Amino acid sequence: MDETALRALIQRIIKEELDPDRIPIGVSNHHIHLTEADFNTLFPNQKMTVLKPLKQPKEFASKQTVDIVGPKGTIKHVRVLGPCRAHSQVEIARSEALNIGVPAPIRLSGHLDGAPSVKLVTPDGEVTVQGVIIAKRHIHMSNEDAKRFGVKLGDTVSVEVQSQDRRTIYNDVICRPREDFVLEMHIDTDEANAANVDGNTFGKIVKA
């Protein structure tokens, strides 16, 4: 690479690094949210134990895992996220839903009406949960971020995911502003693999 090309590359990288409108892409692996009652059934005499904090405030991956049992198969050792919620919810990718024979709909978190059921199993207990979904892609953002992007809660935007060799535009991305949210777009593992997303991938809103 000659000096002119190298200088242009460095300038482009610096510009991208300083761009306030770029959005970190977070890849959401399959996971489970549990009510306190369901947690106690699956893990009697245990407390939910923090494995590592997540990017959004007060949320964490716990040390506890469960097996998801569907009509055609099982997904083993699926991480429980904390803290406990008002409703238990299972989030898996489309490919996983097909593998275990569950017709999971694409929904935002918490929108569980009509979602199918699966059995959750640990060595100490089992529960049947109605609430298996494929998470609809969305962007967590602060209220200040929302003002900067010119969006409000529930707005739909398109985001160009700026991954190497596979730049991809994702439509139908839901904006989810809240005062304490940290800016991050969430996609599932199927979407991430299709777009060659790694742990240092960013996106940018291209249409609002």
From Swiss-Prot:
Which cysteines in this chain are paired by disulphide bridges? none
- The species this protein belongs to is Levilactobacillus brevis (strain ATCC 367 / BCRC 12310 / CIP 105137 / JCM 1170 / LMG 11437 / NCIMB 947 / NCTC 947) (Lactobacillus brevis)
A GO CC term?
bacterial microcompartment
* UniProt keyword annotations, A-Z: Acyltransferase, Bacterial microcompartment, Metal-binding, Transferase, Zinc
What the entry says about domains is: Formed by 2 beta-barrels, each is capped on both ends by short alpha-helices.
Binding of CoA, residues: 27-29, 72, 79, 193
What subcellular compartments does it reside in? Bacterial microcompartment
Q: Where would you say this protein principally sits, based on its record?
A: other
Positions of phosphate binding: 85
The family this protein is said to belong to: Belongs to the PduL family.
Q: What is this protein called?
A: Phosphate propanoyltransferase
- Is the Transferase keyword given for this protein? yes
Q: Which GO terms describe its molecular function?
A: acyltransferase activity, transferring groups other than amino-acyl groups; metal ion binding
One of the GO BP terms on file: propanediol catabolic process
Would the keyword Acyltransferase turn up in this protein's UniProt record? yes
